[in-house]
Amino acid sequence: MGLVSNYLYGPNTLSTEEIHNLTIASYNLKLNPILLIGNIHMPKIIDIIKQVEIKEVCVSNQYKIEDIELLNNSTNSKISISINYENFDYNFFEHIKNNVSSFYYDLNIYRKDVIEKKSLMECESQINQLKSFAKPLYLGGGINISNVKEAIKTISPHGIDISTGLKKSNSVDEEKLKKILDNLGFDEIS
């Protein structure tokens, strides 16, 4: 379950206190929460990780190698890097691959007041380069009813983030979820 820090741009962000409370609730429900965070200095991220007691963190791809090493050496959390079309840097990923457990490729580019959307075709080459590192790759941003099957067939990600595609007010749109599962060949929501 992704918990997006309000230090990031985009929808559905949470305060540190909300993340802490949801982290506890997630562990009680045997769920694996992941903190998505960026736009602040690494020491502050480390403090937040320790404060919310989370076991996995996904940081935006804006940090230096030394920052990723500091994060790795200062916490016991698994580290994932969030990547998009605009901030892709293969050489950087080559240098940090031993400090991260997975990659999260976001088809969206989040800015303060706007979200730029990229197509799967535009990003496919970069995604395939990431797959060469033999680390789990998660795909998100713009995955919805119309493209979820193509995304899975084309990319074969370790997992997909369809949260925005399922949003209905402040809850999950079960009708959209059913359509996505039907599109993937599942008969019913369990």
Name each model feature, range by range.
Residues 1, 33, 56, 80, ...:
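Functionally constrained cores in energy, signaling, and assembly domains
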Residues 1-21:
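Glycine-rich, proline-tolerant flexible connector loops at the mouths of alpha/beta enzymes
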Residues 4-9, 25-34, 40-147:
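Conserved anion-binding
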Residues 18-23, 68-71, 116, 152, ...:
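C-terminal helical cap(s) of enzyme catalytic domains, especially alpha/beta-barrels
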